Amino acid sequence: MNYAAIGCVVGHELSHGFDDQGRRFDAEGNLNNWWDDETSAKYVEKTKCIIYQYGNYTEPSVNLPLNGINTQGENIADNAGFKQAYRAYGKEIAYSMSKIWLSNR
């Protein structure tokens, strides 16, 4: 299975439910602030990092900086997609290695 492709796409799309726009909707799809204050504060701190990171990137073909605020939803989803694909790949490697180890006993 190609974890790089499938994991990134699935992880990316699922993560949109928790990006700067998707997090505002509850389980029924209603616009509702369903996160407690502590969770929201932690989220804001983490998104500041992503906004800063991508806001400091200049697109060389046009020599213009990205707007980290405007692109945060996609940037959050991209990062989450990569992270979940990597985790799934790691689990597959561990599982495969355990099968090899057990078959050699």
Summary of predicted features, one role per range:
Residues 1-5, 16-105:
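Zinc-dependent metallohydrolase catalytic domains
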